[in-house]
């Protein structure tokens, strides 16, 4: 089995090539060379993969370096590796920095996540490490290992606890360079599904609840302070009278 990333195109019913839909996609290919599954990237890079409002403000396209744009995918598509029982989901490019998006890709049957990306446009700076740090949170939030596979950039294995277990480095010790990384990932047992985390099941409910509760406490505090100030002013007025 192999997963590859590539552009994809769906012809428009109108027959006009300008109406075709183009996608940034990942493909699952079987050992026999058959195309088994396709996932289309849902979170596109603004002004990098699409131009917002271009239908209503067409002049915007002249202010960007791209001629057209991709169409966003509509659904999470799990990849099933035939009779092996292995199930995984792919995140493309910077999709691994979006918590709500990543949790949609993980069920009790998901063995691991794969992030395919090209971080070459960052150069050998801190950006790919920052994205790798974000990916670690996605692994912890959903309780699954995550493999980052970069054609240029940080390629690594992150376990379900967010630990960086393996990382690709070339002969010079750099993460940039030709080569490959072989990793071993613990899989679900056929009779034992992975336990879904609280965040995977409920999302930001806890965080939002904490934020609302904090806001209520602040409101109560300010209201009490305002009442005290009014009482103080009233007493001062009476004393003057």
Report residues per predicted region.
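Enzyme catalytic cores with a strong preference for nitrogen-chemistry domains
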Residues: 1-241
């Amino acid at each position: 089995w192999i997963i590859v990333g590539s552009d994809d195109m769906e012809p428009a019913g109108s027959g006009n090539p300008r109406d075709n839909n183009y996608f940034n996609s990942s493909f699952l290919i079987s050992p026999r060379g058959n195309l088994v599954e396709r996932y289309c990237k849902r979170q596109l890079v603004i002004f990098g993969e699409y131009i917002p409002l271009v239908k209503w403000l067409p002049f915007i396209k002249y202010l960007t370096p791209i001629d057209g744009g991709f169409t966003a995918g509509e659904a999470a598509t799990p990849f099933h590796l035939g009779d092996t029982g292995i199930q995984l989901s792919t995140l493309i490019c910077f999709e691994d920095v979006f918590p709500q998006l990543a949790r949609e890709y993980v069920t009790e049957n998901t063995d691991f996540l794969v992030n395919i990306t090209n971080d070459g446009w960052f150069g050998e700076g801190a950006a790919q490490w920052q994205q790798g740090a974000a990916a670690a949170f996605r692994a912890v939030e959903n309780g699954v290992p995550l493999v980052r596979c970069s054609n240029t950039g940080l390629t690594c294995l992150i376990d379900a606890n967010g630990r960086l277990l393996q990382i690709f480095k070339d002969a010079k010790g750099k993460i940039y360079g030709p080569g490959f990384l072989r990793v071993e990932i613990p899989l679900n047992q056929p009779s034992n599904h992975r336990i879904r985390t609280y965040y995977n099941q409920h999302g930001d409910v806890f965080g939002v609840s904490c934020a609302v509760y904090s806001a209520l406490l602040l409101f109560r505090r300010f209201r009490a302070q305002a009442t005290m100030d009014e009482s103080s002013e009233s007493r001062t007025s009476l004393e003057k009278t």
